[in-house]
């Protein structure tokens, strides 16, 4: 009987599962002028998160700087319908026709409210992509980690010492 009670309690927790946005994914190679799907990656989380809006930008990899968007590609309202969802969100963006072949950083900034107290947060994600002759079907995902004694920060495919 106690097993059934525990099972029922666990099942009720699963139904209350929350989610948050944990990164972005974009085609590894993009063609200038193409409309592409930017994937906003989600994951399960321990508390509720209200995602308000996300904006995307692009910069040449050589001049990209963490936490900036550079040339704006688009911004999207997320709101209640796209908050706390455990399936990825797709947003359309257009790669500027003016981009010459080479390596670029596509960045995103996300404004969210965390938990019962609605604590505001801005999260930044980025992915290094190549501008080439055609848009690939292979996607690359942002990464975030803070290094140890080297104080190395890796943000979405490019690394800078701090």
Swiss-Prot record:
Function: Secreted effector that induces necrotic lesions in Nicotiana benthamiana. Interacts with the host receptor-like kinases (RLKs) BAK1/SERK3 and BKK1/SERK4, inhibits their kinase activity and suppresses INF1-induced pathogen-associated molecular pattern (PAMP)-triggered immunity (PTI) in N.benthamiana. Also interacts with the host receptor-like cytoplasmic kinase (RLCK) BIK1 and inhibits its kinase activity, thereby inhibiting PAMP-induced ROS generation. In PTI, phosphorylation relaying by RLKs and RLCKs is critical for the initiation of downstream signaling.
Underlying gene: NIS1
Name the record gives this protein: Necrosis-inducing secreted protein 1
Region (BAK1/SERK3-binding): 103-132
InterPro entries: Nis1
Keyword annotations: Glycoprotein, Host cytoplasm, Secreted, Signal, Virulence
SUBUNIT field: Interacts with the host pattern recognition receptor (PRR)-associated kinases BAK1/SERK3, BKK1/SERK4 and BIK1.
Family per similarity comment: Belongs to the NIS1 effector family.
Signal peptide stretch: 1-19
Domain remark text: The C-terminal region from residues 103 to 132 is important for BAK1/SERK3-binding and the host cell death suppression.
Organism: Colletotrichum orbiculare (strain 104-T / ATCC 96160 / CBS 514.97 / LARS 414 / MAFF 240422) (Cucumber anthracnose fungus)
Record has Cytoplasm as a keyword: no
